[in-house]
Amino acid sequence: MAQEKFSFRKETKLKIKFLILFIFSFNIQSSNLVLDFNNLIVNNFEFTQKTETNSSTTESKGKIFRMENEIKIEITEPSKELYRIIENKIEIYDYDFNQTSIYQIDDNNGHVLDFIINGVKKAVVKDLTNSSFSIKNGDNDILIELNEDNGFSLTYIDNMQFKNIINFQVIK
């Protein structure tokens, strides 16, 4: 009987050690993937965005350039636009209509911009796999998938309930 109690305690301690090791390794995996993403996001990118509406799919193309105090997003197709992100505002230049607008970035409109500017905080990561994770975006999630050739993709549902897939590739 004493032998059984000793064996049970030893087995329980072993299970606890395995559980701790599993949780620790999951946390390391999470940290590495998020760290890889945050290291990747500081580059300049070319991107293609596909938006699936109820009846069609539209495609936009452009580039993202990071400078010391601003981020420039140039849309080259299907129309020409420039977005300048400086501190907590975004300046929009629509070259086709010769219009300029300035908006404040806040919690209601800045989820995707926030992690493109600042990276992802490990605390908001969920649904982690070897090459992807999700983060909360208002009522929806944003799926981030890293690919092996210095790029990543974002998949999310926007505020109009349209599915968006954006593929980013580092400019070399």
Regions found by a protein language model. Name each.
Residues 7-18:
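Bacterial N-terminal signal peptides that target proteins for export
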